[in-house]
Structure formats: structure tokens, C-alpha cells
A protein has these predicted regions:
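Glycine-centered hinge/linker elements that transmit conformational signals in sensory
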Residues: 174-181, 215, 219-252
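Conserved N-terminal structural module of periplasmic/extracytoplasmic solute-binding proteins
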Residues: 2-102, 109, 297-298, 319-320, ...
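Extracytoplasmic/periplasmic substrate-binding proteins
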Residues: 40, 101, 203-207, 235-317, ...
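Long, aromatic- and glycine/proline-rich binding clefts that accommodate carbohydrate-like moieties
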Residues: 288, 339-392, 423-427
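Hinge/lid segment of periplasmic solute-binding proteins
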Residues: 96-146, 201-204, 208, 289-291, ...
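Short helix-initiation/N-cap motifs at beta->coil->alpha
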Residues: 71-80, 99, 168-172, 251-263
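Alpha-to-beta junction loops
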Residues: 85-96, 186-187, 263-271
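Periplasmic-binding protein-like
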Residues: 50, 151, 326-346
């Protein structure tokens, strides 16, 4: 199937033209018999160094199939992939954000992986990407959302400290927010991180919707959002979510990157595991509680899935490409990933070897939360559109739009996209 047959979601014509030239001028690197690898880590020197160390070691052991790397800034990466697909210049190996994988597989960019069954089985579910019954991507790590709270504030209010075994209920969470909001030394009870953009809103707030009993789409066949995104349970979620801001418990315009929490303006912060160490450095490890998500009635959930590796459908040497991915997924490199960027390894055997996730490690609670509550975003090629539509709907709800009609329109828009793409059927 031609890789240009279907539209790459989110790629503009100008970006295609610009990025084709950029990629073509830098592409290549394997030479005769070699394989090419593209990554989004051009602006992340620590993660890029881990990948480069694996490439160097692999190339020493496999001189006939050396890997050549191209690193792009994350903001330009997806456009680069889309442009390369249009021009027929996809690399052999590419990394991708987990929820994007079904769209790229459906569009013909990716081939199913042929890694060993032993490795596949050893990887946690949230770091594996399946579509249409086949494994297309695996990731070296994942992270988790969590609630960060000041121990001193929680103790002052006297509210129960939730655990993975017994998360807060909605009533308990609402009570805790009310008590925290009454503390005069803080401006708001919680920073909900609404200043963040991109994929954050679906990643962070759809799990709350799902805990209420709604969802982004019917996950049985991904054929409709009606009755899920606009269900009574979804309306209840929207009503509660907006009340956080309308009732003055959270700011609609918080500082970016958790600065309100770090500067002592709020006692609680809805964030990811990547903010734990900075928070502990600011206040001390004992003062920062890492708390699980709230159970709003249908189980507690957090978003799952991070960056993963796949093999392009046009690879001239898929055997070597899969072999490199297996090499990169060894414990040695999973530990390096974890120590470099703070995420937990996707294979259990690597965890005790890490600095932060071993028993008693500063980030051990983050992995515990992720393992207990991670829910992958819908594995459908239409997810990119679903994500964008939900993002807009949630923002509109916070800004005061009618909740039921906003969710009705969002469900209609998602269903229209599904129909327009013939149900995103595999061919």
C-alpha cells in the first residue's frame, strides 16, 4: 500500500514542502547495508545520549548493518515524518508518541514488529502499541500522572492521605479541596495544570472523564463517540470539572510548568512523575506527597503510553531494524533512560537497577501509580482528531459553554470524522 494514500493528520502543505527539503538534506547515515533512525530528541540531550550510546555499541557489534541517526526538535518531528512519507523517504526506525501509532500504522507508515515473544511479554502493557491485532511499537519507559501535595497542608487540614490501595473518592477529594482552599497561606487549593497545551488535556483529563463513567469513544469497536462522550456521566464530569474553576478552587490562568506549586502559592498540583524530583528538591522529599488519582465512581485512572520505537513499512532491512530495537530494549539501556530522564523502565527486571525506582527510590510511588491505574488512550487511527476535539470541548466547558451541547457537538464531530474516513478500517 502506498504510504501517501492516506492523509497524515495534522501535517500542513507548507510544512510538507519545508520539511521534505530539510529531511532530504540530512537523511541517510547507514550507507550500504546500513539502517537509518529518526528521533524526536534533537532538543533533549540526555535522552539523545542514551540512544547514541546504544547505537555506538550496536554498530561495533554489527559493522555490516550500522545505524545512522537523525535527531529532530520535537516540535518539527511529526511534520518531518509526514513529509518523508509523502516523498517516500521514511527511515528504517522511527520513534513515535504512543497514541499516534494507530494512525501511522493505518496510513501505511509502519510495519508490524518482529521482536522476540520473550521481549514482547516482558514489556508493560502501557509501553506496547497494538493495532488491528499486531504489535507495531514498543517503548523503553513510561511515566504516570499523580497528585503532588504538601504534607504540611494535608496534615493541617486533617484529611486522609490516599493510597494506591485506597484512593480518594469524589466526596473525599471535594472535601480535601475545600479544606485546602480555606488555608489562608495559599491562593488556590490546586493547580490543575490547565496552562499546559498540546496533548496534555486529553492525557490528563480524559482519565477523569472515564472515572466518572464516560469515555472519548466506544472502545469496543471505535465506531462512535455518541453515548460515551456525551453520556450523562460525561456531563457530570464536565459539571464537576468546571466547578473547580467557578468555585475558586483552581485558577483558569495558573503559571506554566507548575510554578504556582513550586513557589508555594498552591498546596496541591496535578502533574506527571517528571515533576516529582524538582518538587522534592524545592520542599524536601518528606514534604512532597505523591498521591494516586481520584476514584470518581468507576475506578481511578491515569493516562498511559509514552514515546515508543517502530519500524517503517518501507524499511529495506526490517530484520536489522527489529534487531536494533531489541538491542535498545536491554536492561542496560532501560536503566540509562530512567536515570537520564526520570521515567520508569518498561521492563520489570530493569527497575531495581535504577536510581529512582528501586525499592525506596524517590520515584517509586510514580511507577506504583502507573502500574495500578494506567489506561491507554483509544487505539484508533482517529485518535488525533478525537484528541483535538476533546481538547477544544474541555476548554470551552471551563470557559463557561453549555456542557451538554458542547459534548453533543464534540461527539457529532468525532462521528463525522469516523464516517469521513470509512470507519478507519484496515485495508
Amino acid at each position: 500500500m502506498s504510504t501517501t494514500r492516506r492523509t497524515f493528520l495534522g501535517l500542513g502543505a507548507t510544512a510538507v514542502a519545508a520539511t521534505v527539503t530539510a529531511c532530504s538534506s540530512r537523511a541517510g547515515g547507514g550507507g550500504s547495508g546500513g539502517i537509518t533512525l529518526w528521533t524526536h530528541n534533537g532538543g533533549n540531550k540526555d535522552e539523545l545520549a542514551v540512544v547514541q550510546s546504544a547505537i555506538d555499541a550496536f554498530n561495533r557489534r554489527n559493522p555490516d548493518t550500522p545505524v545512522g541517526i537523525e535527531a529532530f526538535p520535537q516540535a518539527a518531528y511529526n511534520d518531518a515524518i509526514g513529509a518523508a512519507a509523502v516523498s517516500g523517504d521514511l527511515p528504517d526506525i522511527l520513534d513515535l508518541d504512543g497514541p499516534v501509532m494507530p494512525n501511522w500504522a493505518w496510513a501505511g507508515y509502519l510495519a508490524p514488529l518482529t521482536i522476540s515473544s520473550e521481549l514482547e511479554t516482558s514489556i508493560i502493557d502501557s509501553a506496547k502499541g497494538y493495532w488491528n491485532g499486531a504489535l507495531y511499537s514498543v517503548g523503553p519507559y513510561d511515566t504516570s500522572l499523580c497528585l503532588l501535595a504538601r504534607r504540611s497542608a494535608i496534615e493541617e487540614t486533617g484529611v486522609r492521605v490516599p493510597t494506591v490501595a485506597r484512593p480518594w473518592t469524589r466526596d473525599e477529594f471535594d472535601h480535601a479541596l475545600g479544606e485546602l482552599g480555606a488555608l489562608t497561606q495559599y491562593e488556590y487549593a490546586i493547580d490543575m495544570s490547565v496552562a499546559d497545551g498540546a496533548e496534555w488535556w486529553p492525557y490528563a483529563y480524559a482519565p477523569m472523564l472515564q472515572s466518572f463513567g464516560g469515555d472519548l469513544i466506544d472502545r469496543t469497536d471505535f465506531s462512535t463517540a455518541k453515548g460515551f462522550l456525551n453520556a450523562p456521566e460525561a456531563v457530570a464530569w464536565g459539571t464537576w470539572f468546571r466547578s473547580l474553576f467557578a468555585d475558586g478552587l483552581a485558577s483558569q490562568t495558573p503559571a506554566t510548568d507548575g510554578q504556582d506549586f513550586l513557589q508555594g502559592k498552591v498546596p496541591m498540583y496535578y502533574a506527571g512523575g517528571w515533576k516529582v524530583l524538582q518538587s522534592q528538591e524545592t520542599f524536601g522529599q518528606e514534604e512532597v506527597l505523591v498521591l494516586p488519582p481520584v476514584d470518581f465512581g468507576r475506578g481511578a485512572h491515569v493516562g498511559g503510553g509514552s514515546w515508543q520505537w517502530g519500524v517503517s513499512a518501507t524499511s529495506r532491512n526490517p530484520e536489522a531494524a527489529n534487531r536494533f530495537i531489541e538491542f535498545l530494549m536491554q536492561d542496560e539501556y532501560l536503566v540509562r533512560y530512567s536515570d537520564a530522564i526520570g521515567n520508569f523502565p518498561s521492563v520489570e527486571s530493569a527497575t531495581p537497577l535504577t536510581e529512582n525506582y528501586k525499592d525506596g527510590g524517590a520515584l517509586a510511588p510514580v511507577r506504583e501509580i502507573g502500574e495500578a491505574f494506567a489506561l491507554l488512550r483509544p487505539a484508533t487511527p482517529g485518535y488525533r482528531v478525537i484528541s483535538s476535539i476533546f481538547d477544544k470541548a474541555a476548554r470551552d466547558i471551563v470557559s463557561g459553554a453549555d456542557i451538554k451541547s458542547t459534548l453533543d457537538q464534540a461527539a457529532d464531530n468525532i462521528d463525522f470524522d469516523i464516517r469521513s474516513n470509512d470507519g478507519y478500517r484496515a485495508v
